[in-house]
Amino acid sequence: MHLSLLKTKIHRATVTHSELNYEGSIAIDDNLLAATGIREFEQVHIWDVTNGARFSTYAIRAEAGSGVVSLNGGAARHVQVGDIIIIAAFASMTEQEADSFKPKLVYVDGNNQISHTNDTIPTQAA
């Protein structure tokens, strides 16, 4: 059996651009792509913390160090500049692979620069 597990996420990125007439995708600062292991053209899920929208698209590169997180094409209709989003990618793996797998969790500041990374999420308490 194969399981779909969270491979990586960029937590609480700020949308810097929204380009309706650009070819569809999400442009992400290349430093963030490198830190997460998200590949260009890989499917990503976008969860808008600000408005609750959830959708998928694919990643393309933005200039390294720029802090750019730009939603393009139809995806631009789901967000506004300034929205806080989570960008996630999943991977399919066997149960044995899942037993030792650790996701790459990348946390960013208000300028979409890496503040810290982790491979676990704290247990949520009641």
UniProtKB/Swiss-Prot annotation:
Localisation: Cytoplasm
Obligatory cofactor(s): pyruvate
GO molecular function, one term: aspartate 1-decarboxylase activity
Enzyme Commission number(s) from the entry: 4.1.1.11
Reactions accelerated catalytically: L-aspartate + H(+) = beta-alanine + CO2
Main location per the UniProt record: cytoplasm
Residues bearing the modification Pyruvic acid (Ser): S25
Matches recorded under Pfam families: Asp_decarbox
Positions annotated to bind substrate: T57, G73, G74, A75
Keywords of this entry: Autocatalytic cleavage, Cytoplasm, Decarboxylase, Lyase, Pantothenate biosynthesis, Pyruvate, Schiff base, Zymogen
Cofactor remark: Binds 1 pyruvoyl group covalently per subunit.
Gene Ontology terms: biological process: alanine biosynthetic process; pantothenate biosynthetic process
Annotated GO CC locations: cytosol
Family (UniProt): Belongs to the PanD family.
Subunit structure comment from the entry: Heterooctamer of four alpha and four beta subunits.
Name the UniProt record assigns to this protein: Aspartate 1-decarboxylase
Gene: panD
